[in-house]
Design a protein with these regions (language model features):
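Membrane-proximal helix-turn-helix segments that form the acceptor-binding/catalytic region
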Residues: 1-12
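Acidic anion/phosphate-binding donor-loop and adjacent secondary structure
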Residues: 24, 38-55
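Helix-loop-beta element that forms the nucleotide-linked donor phosphate-binding surface
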Residues: 7-8, 20-41
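Nucleotide-activated donor-binding/catalytic signature segment of Leloir-type glycosyltransferases, i.e.
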Residues: 99-123
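Conserved acidic donor-binding segment of nucleotide-sugar-dependent glycosyltransferases
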Residues: 116, 174-181, 189-194
Length: 209
């Protein structure tokens, strides 16, 4: 049914190159006129990262996840990877989660679930974080990724998601992983290298704009 719809459309607007490639492959509709339009996104000109730290009593450097806390979003694997990382590689980082949860969250001193927050808290949290982590395999376009780049923060993404991987490669503003070993190596590189974080973050701002 959907294949016929995509083949008979007069024109199609796609959110990303990877989305276009997928639809072309499954629908055989490369003949249909199309354009990559992305989606509009705004971030504040000024943020208050220290206000966020004081409000939520977070003293350690942290990485942040923004979105529904759900196994389908890769959060169960993220918990496993992160706990393994802070146990065996580096115990300095915390993981901050912003968003409603439909998944049990491990009771761990370095995992902080803030629930649903205001946009101000969300953006201040992103600005305070070392990086944004996106563990989902299934994204057609990640708004949180674009927002993080708009704020000059690098991204660590699930490399099994073609869209996220493609965005990281085109922007040169993020790293990606396919397994725990790559997750740990990429996270350790980002955690320990301020020049790397700043360089990727700078590229992210440029890509966002």
């Amino acid at each position: 049914i959907f294949g016929q719809i995509f083949r008979n459309a007069r024109a199609i607007m796609y959110n990303s190159f990877e989305e276009q490639i997928l639809i072309n492959a499954v629908s055989d509709n490369a003949h249909v006129p199309s354009v990559i339009v992305g989606v509009g996104s705004k971030v504040p000109h000024h943020t208050a990262p220290e206000r966020f730290r004081r409000k939520f009593k977070i003293d350690h450097p942290f990485i942040i996840y923004v979105g529904r806390v759900d196994a389908n979003k890769g959060c169960k694997q993220l918990f496993e990877y992160f706990i393994r990382y802070v146990t065996n590689v580096s115990g300095k980082l915390s993981l901050v989660l912003i968003g409603n949860s439909v998944l049990p969250i491990p009771a761990h001193e370095r995992i902080h679930h803030l629930g649903f927050t205001s946009d101000k808290d969300k953006f201040d949290g992103m600005a305070a974080a070392e990086l944004l982590v996106i563990p989902s395999q299934y994204e057609s376009l990640s708004m949180a990724t674009l927002e993080a780049w708009g704020l000059g923060r690098p991204v660590l993404a699930n490399g099994h998601c073609d869209v996220l991987k493609g965005q990281c490669l085109r922007s040169n503003a993020g790293l990606y992983y396919d397994n725990y070993e790559e997750f740990a190596e990429a996270l350790h590189a980002l955690e320990t290298s301020s020049p790397l974080r700043k360089g990727l973050g700078h590229n992210g701002r440029r890509f966002f704009s």
